[in-house]
Amino acid sequence: MTGMVGTILRRKAEQNMTDVTIRNVTKRYGALTVIPQLSFRIEDGEFVVLVGPSGCGKSTLLRMLAGLEEISGGDLLMGADVINDRPAKERDMAIVFQNYALYPHMTVAENMGFALKLRKRPRAEIDERVDKAAAILGLGKLLDRYPRALSGGQRQRVAMGRAIVRDPQVFLFDEPLSNLDAKLRVQMRAEIKALHQRLKITTVYVTHDQIEAMTMADKIVVMNEGRVEQMGTPLELYDRPANIFVAGFIGSPSMNFLPATVAATNGPLLKTPEGVALPIDGGPTLTGRSEVTYGIRPEHLQLGETGIPAEVVVVEPTGSETQLYVTVGGREVVAVLRDRVDVRPGEKIWLTPRKGCAHLFDPNTGARIAG
């Protein structure tokens, strides 16, 4: 193994494990508490994505990790070391921002090597590390250009190259793809994931885009109002969301939710308030419950001859699939069908949930019951 990738991996092998622990971390602005006692751990080499709606505290947490925001309580640890009071420049972390944060009067090479220049590293070392990072990111022919002559994707690669050149223990990404168009976002998220697979550096990535989270992460932390709703692998969150918030946030289009009453017959029977029967299977334990929230993902609904009666409102064909917006008992439901279908607004259809794919939640707490 040669080049900068080999150098970074050898350095990691010589160091202690770079896990990151957030332990009872609190953030207050005056009397306002925006993060109340947050705790979780990021293992060495993991790619962890913090995801959630605007204002949930994910960027604030990232800035506290970077040393750009003070914490109000609790501890931040790298390995066994508490870094609460360690200045940002001494935390051995490199951050990539949404707006690239490139110096317009510096060339690509000068931008990438600037942190090493501030550390008064030898010119030969700076040039070598810049050249190796440029080779990893395909920037070799752009080193003499200025940021104004670069595309958005090229600028983001330069920002990533600047982080790589620093050879940090932890990478931090703060919504780095938000300014890019849809096609370039897809390309860049694949490049960032491939980069992590090569360098194996502990990475914390912030986004509001759950598609980015699902496609890039080893683990996802879903945040809401400064709290962790659930942490797990992408498929764990998709298959077994801990509550209605996670179920509705992970997946696109969002999971459908219908209120239901429980009637005990030979087995549990669910009906909407309008009397529409909702199929369930697997015999979930609903003893003592009179009401639940029924959840089913759009991609787990199929056209059938029986099932849930619905009326078509809007048909959206995309070529590879068809999205149907329908009403069930007066409530909007979305179905994503892989097959091309000939249905029209106003038409009555039946939707059949795929077996084993229904989710049940407590309507009062939002917590998962079964399914």
From Swiss-Prot:
The keyword RNA-binding does not apply. Gene3D superfamilies: 2.40.50.100, Nucleic acid-binding proteins, P-loop containing nucleotide triphosphate hydrolases. The keyword Signal does not apply. Probably part of a binding-protein-dependent transport system y4oPQRS. This system probably transports a sugar-like molecule. Probably responsible for energy coupling to the transport system. Keywords: ATP-binding, Cell inner membrane, Cell membrane, Membrane, Nucleotide-binding, Plasmid, Transport. GO terms for molecular function: ABC-type transporter activity; ATP binding; ATP hydrolysis activity. One of its GO terms (cellular component) is ATP-binding cassette (ABC) transporter complex, substrate-binding subunit-containing. Belongs to the ABC transporter superfamily. It is found in: Cell inner membrane. NCBIfam families: PRK11650.1. One of its GO terms (biological process) is carbohydrate transport. InterPro entries: AAA+_ATPase, ABC_transporter-like_ATP-bd, ABC_transporter-like_CS, ABC_transpr_MalK-like, ABC_transpr_MalK/UgpC-like, Mo/tungstate-bd_C_term_dom, NA-bd_OB-fold, OB_MalK-like. ATP binds at residues 52-59. It holds the Pfam family ABC_tran. Residues 20-250 form the ABC transporter domain. The lineage of its organism: Bacteria, Pseudomonadati, Pseudomonadota, Alphaproteobacteria, Hyphomicrobiales. It is a peripheral membrane protein. This is Uncharacterized ABC transporter ATP-binding protein y4oS. Its main location: membrane.
